[in-house]
Swiss-Prot record:
Residues 5-65 form the HTH iclR-type domain. GO terms for biological process: negative regulation of DNA-templated transcription. The keyword Transcription applies. Keywords: DNA-binding, Repressor, Transcription, Transcription regulation. The gene is kipR. Induction: Induced by glucose when readily available sources of nitrogen, such as ammonia or glutamine, are scarce. The lineage of its organism: Bacteria, Bacillati, Bacillota, Bacilli, Bacillales. This is HTH-type transcriptional regulator KipR.
Length: 250
């Protein structure tokens, strides 16, 4: 059993080399691992037979398609709500504001999880509720980190309707807010979905480094004071990064 475990460890060490180089020859694998050529040849032959490695016409090895299959299975089975909830609960305890998780659904955002703080205010947001991508910090944290051409196409085809007194309805101003969000790594909104409320949102990225969701804190506008904003923004950004890493972002 111990010898089998050693073989597994050595095989993993060999496979890890392909994280840094797309293809490697047998000689390169021997040089990088420091293992005997016969041992390396035996391992790569077994890994190739099982589909973990593939070999091209020149004899160089690369990761096999089985990794793509496994990777897709892992991605499909990740429940972002389940992963995010403990982080959201901790964030709520720290800032004592409502914490929300939002995901994109076409040209809208849908609230998929929410943790209430101790404040008596009950906001516009609720699980299952929708908002346009341009309005509110949480939704805009998703819009801001989409590919630029997709953002511009969205703004061009979307009528920016006022929802609250602070909703951004000017396309140029919206683009400016998006640029600021990208630069800062977070989005702030005041009275965009509901008057006298404020929110700070940050993007959550997946294993493909694409925006997968957004997390925000929201509450009374009066509680989002200028001197408190730096603390709140760092907390939201940190929570977003924690969740991103848990779903494969590197």
């Amino acid at each position: 059993m111990q010898n089998k475990n050693k073989t597994v460890v050595k095989s993993m060490a060999l496979l890890n080399l392909f994280l840094h180089k797309p293809s490697l020859t047998l000689s390169e694998l021997v040089s990088l691992t420091g293992m005997p050529k016969t041992s390396v040849h035996r391992m790569v032959s077994s890994l190739e037979e099982m589909g973990f490695l593939s070999r091209d016409a020149s004899g160089a090895y690369s990761l096999g398609l089985v990794f793509l299959e496994f990777g897709q299975l892992v991605a499909d089975r990740l429940d972002i709500r389940k992963i995010a909830k403990p982080v959201m609960e901790e964030l709520c305890r720290e800032v004592d504001e409502a914490v929300q998780l939002i995901m994109r659904d076409g040209n809208e955002a849908i609230y998929v999880e929410k943790i209430e703080g101790t404040q008596t205010v009950r906001l516009y947001t609720a699980i299952g509720r929708r908002s346009p991508l341009y309005a509110g910090a949480c939704a805009r944290s998703i819009l801001s980190f989409l590919p630029r051409e997709e953002i511009e196409a969205y703004i061009k085809q979307t009528e920016l309707i006022s929802i609250g007194s602070g909703t951004i309805t000017d396309p140029e101003k919206l683009l400016q807010e998006i640029d600021a969000s990208v630069q800062n790594g977070y989005t702030v909104s005041y009275s965009e979905l509901e008057n006298y409320t404020a929110a700070i949102g940050a993007p959550i990225f997946n294993h493909e480094r694409q925006v997968a969701a957004g997390i925000s804190i929201a509450g009374f506008e009066a509680r989002f004071t200028e001197d408190r904003l730096p603390y709140l923004t760092e907390k939201v950004k940190d929570a977003a990064l924690q969740i991103s890493r848990k779903i494969g972002y590197t």
